[in-house]
C-alpha cells in the first residue's frame, strides 16, 4: 500500500514523499491516520536531526516519519493481534514506549509510523507496551490531543506534590 508522509532526513530536512509501505507481518497492524496534532517537539527533532535523542543516527539513509500526536483507525491486523484489534477500530497512540529502555518512539524513530502520514505500519513494540489505545470519541482531532493532555497531567502530578514519589497533596 502506498502512503504519503513527511519524512525527516536530517537537520531542517523534511520531505513530503509518497512511497510503498511493506506488507505487514503477523505482529504488526496497518492503520490510517486521520488527525495529527503539531507539537514543538517535532520542530525540535527537525532542528536537531540525528542529534536529537529520539532520532536515529542513520536518519539521512533511513528517514523517519514525523508526528507523534495522532489518532486514526485500524485497516488490517496481523494474526498475533486479531483477538484484540479489528479493522475499523479507532485508536490513539501513546508514543512514549520506553520499550526495553529505548527512547525510540513513533513520530521520531521509525520509518513506517508517524502521525504525518496517510497510512502507517504499527510495529509490535507499540502493542507490547500497551500504547495502541482504543478511542471511542466522536472527532479524531480530540484523540490526537490525548498525548499532549497526558503531558499536562504528568507535569501536574510531578510538580504539585511536596515530596517526590508521594502523591499526597500539600
PLM feature spans:
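Local cysteine-cluster metal-coordination motifs and their immediate loop/turn environment
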Residues: 40
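Extracellular beta-rich ligand/substrate-recognition surface
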Residues: 6-14
Amino acid at each position: 500500500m502506498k502512503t504519503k508522509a513527511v519524512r525527516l532526513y536530517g537537520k531542517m530536512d523534511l520531505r513530503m514523499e509518497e512511497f510503498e509501505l511493506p506488507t505487514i507481518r503477523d505482529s504488526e497492524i496497518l492503520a490510517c491516520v486521520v488527525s495529527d496534532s503539531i507539537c514543538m517537539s517535532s520542530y525540535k527533532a527537525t532542528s536537531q536531526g540525528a542529534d536529537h535523542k529520539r532520532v536515529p543516527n542513520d536518519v539521512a539513509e533511513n528517514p523517519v516519519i514525523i508526528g507523534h500526536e495522532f489518532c486514526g483507525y485500524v485497516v488490517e491486523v496481523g494474526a498475533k493481534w486479531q483477538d484484540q484489534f479489528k479493522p475499523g477500530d479507532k485508536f490513539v497512540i501513546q508514543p512514549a514506549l520506553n520499550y526495553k529502555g529505548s527512547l525510540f518512539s513513533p513520530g521520531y524513530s521509525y520509518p513506517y509510523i508517524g502521525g504525518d502520514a496517510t497510512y502507517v505500519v504499527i510495529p509490535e513494540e507499540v502493542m507490547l507496551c500497551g500504547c495502541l489505545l482504543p478511542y471511542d470519541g466522536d472527532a479524531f482531532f480530540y484523540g490526537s490531543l490525548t498525548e499532549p493532555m497526558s503531558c499536562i497531567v504528568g507535569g501536574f502530578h510531578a510538580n504539585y506534590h511536596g515530596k517526590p514519589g508521594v502523591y499526597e497533596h500539600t
